[in-house]
Each structure stands twice: as structure tokens, then as C-alpha cells.
Amino acid sequence: SKLIFTREESQTASTPRHEMEIHLRLGANKDGRIRGLDLYTLSNTGAYGEHGPTTVGLSGHKSIPLYSSAEAFRFTYDVVYTNHMSAGAYRGYGATQGLFAVESAVNELAAKLHMDPFKIREMNIVHEGDVMPAYYGAVNTSCTLDRCLAKVHEMINLSLIHISEPTRLALI
């Protein structure tokens, strides 16, 4: 059997993603080397908290390790029950909210330092063989983030060749 909802029914009957308010402080040298990350997440789990603690935890536990070159990091959070529909599990399961905040902060850092955001990421992202402090000193034995980032950079540069510099930087 198959159940097909209209758009309105889907919005009424399904669970929303966890609403999160994220405060992030990013510390870096003038050359763009990230020295510290301080992330606080306030998560609205709705009226019931089946996924509340897990989801909010992933907003920091999946985003901070991407920049493992940082010498200091802190992740704190609160989960609140509200008079809203309970939030459910979706792809990314909390990580997407944290990643959006961290990547937005990296873009803001790049703008402030007048640097290419890809250059800052290349200098700071986790690489294969790196020790990952956020994962209790485990060694990263499998990671192709650097190659993925290089491919994205290539694809974006090819698609933005005919766009003016200020517009191109705003899009990246």
C-alpha cells in the first residue's frame, strides 16, 4: 500500500526539523589559521524530546571536528521543550544546523581577512592521518574532504568565470 500526502497534509501531519539557535565564536590568526571554536546551541525539541539530546549533540560533534587544527574548542547546548510540534529525525540529524553555522562563520572570517574562503578551509580542515581531539585523540584513517573541496572550488570557479569579482565573492 502507499500513502501520498498533499503538500498541506505533509506540513500538518509530519514532524519538523529541530529548530536551533546557534551562537558561534571563531578565533583565528591574521593568516586565517583557526585557533579556537566556541559553539553554543539552543535546540527546540517541541513538546516531547525523543530526539532532543542526540540531535543537539550532533550540531557540535559533527561540525567542530571538521576544523581539527584548532587548538581550543568548546561546545555547549541546551534543549528546551516548547508548546510546538515535536521535532523529528531527518537527514543530517542535527549536523546540518551546526555545519551551516560553522561554515557561515568561516565565510565571515574570510571576508574580514580579505581571503579566499576556500584557502581558509584548505588550511584548516581535517585531513587523513590527522589526530582528532574532538574524538578523544583518534586518528582519522579515511578522509577525502580536501579532494572534495578542491573539486567544488574548481566547479565553482568554472561556473563563475563571467561574473564580476564582488558578486563572485558574495556567492562563495
Task: Describe each PLM feature range.
Residues 1-164, 168:
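Structural alpha/beta core scaffold segments of enzyme domains
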Residues 170-172:
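Short, ordered, surface-exposed loop/turn motifs in non-cytosolic proteins
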